[in-house]
């Protein structure tokens, strides 16, 4: 996970598990301020928890395995009383995932990589509605290497979260949402990106993307992006190639209004090698 430049008074956690196919989550809450603070925790299933007297610089762990939850997948909102906090979530099972909590949402988050039915990999996108009203969200999928453009629509209640992508490409489930609709093809290999293109109540949203390959216990997690934060220059702190069998790749989404010329990216990549 990435470090923090600052905390926030409210933190949103879109993806939490309790015994979800063997996965449980836990998260650390750190006081980044200069005064003692209390933290109230509200889960999307209606349960609550709290932290009292969290001192400056101190952190405390909250484990979902020790809490009472009916659903296996849910979300949380943390509210600090007196100082900003930072939160990191760990998803623990046969594969280890991690992501950082969100301080704010945006109406149309972007997910640069969706990887479905690709050599055993599948992707689950958890989107949390951090607003005060229910909203119907449409996610549009755009292929880059493989697949067909399609859409998926679901209702997300205020404070709650819903799983996108997984149940329209990889795994069928019983749908009870009257607003649910999709043009995606179950079982299709899809490699591309996704974006929230409709949000009926214009609620702020946050999202976490999980990619998993069960057979070899491989996976990764990242947080969705606000298009307004897009830049013309991107810095990658770690790039690997043939490093004890590891290599890296990246997915880049054009969040602007104009198309990019073919080859524009490959002609403007600079690699810096470490000394020694």
Regions found by a protein language model. Give the residues of each.
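Gly/Pro-rich, tryptophan- and cysteine-flecked surface segments typical
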Residues: 1-276
């Amino acid at each position: 996970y990435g470090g923090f430049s600052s905390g926030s008074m409210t933190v949103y956690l879109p993806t939490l598990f309790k015994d979800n196919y063997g996965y449980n989550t836990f998260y650390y809450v750190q006081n980044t301020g200069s005064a003692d603070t209390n933290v109230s925790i509200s889960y999307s299933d209606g349960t609550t928890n709290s932290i009292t007297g969290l001192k400056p610089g101190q952190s405390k762990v909250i484990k979902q395995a020790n809490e009472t939850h009916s659903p296996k997948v849910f979300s949380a909102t943390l509210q600090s009383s007196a100082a900003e906090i930072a939160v990191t979530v760990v998803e623990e099972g046969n594969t280890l995932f991690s992501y950082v909590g969100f301080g704010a949402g945006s109406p149309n988050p972007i997910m640069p990589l969706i990887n479905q039915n690709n050599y055993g990999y599948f992707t689950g996108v958890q989107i949390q509605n951090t607003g005060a009203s229910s909203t119907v969200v449409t996610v549009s999928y755009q292929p880059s290497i493989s697949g067909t453009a399609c859409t998926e629509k679901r209702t997300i209640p205020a404070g709650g979260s819903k799983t996108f992508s997984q149940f329209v490409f990889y795994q069928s489930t019983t749908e009870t949402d009257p607003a649910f609709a999709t043009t995606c093809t179950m079982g299709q290999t899809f490699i591309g990106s996704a974006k929230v293109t409709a949000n009926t109540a214009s609620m702020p949203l946050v999202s976490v993307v999980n990619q998993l390959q069960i057979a070899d216990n491989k996976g990764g997690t990242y947080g969705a992006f606000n298009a307004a934060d897009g830049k013309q220059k991107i810095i990658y702190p770690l790039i690997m190639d043939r490093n004890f069998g590891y290599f890296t790749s990246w997915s880049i989404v054009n969040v602007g209004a104009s198309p990019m010329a073919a080859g524009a990216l490959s002609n403007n990549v600079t690699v810096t090698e470490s000394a020694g």
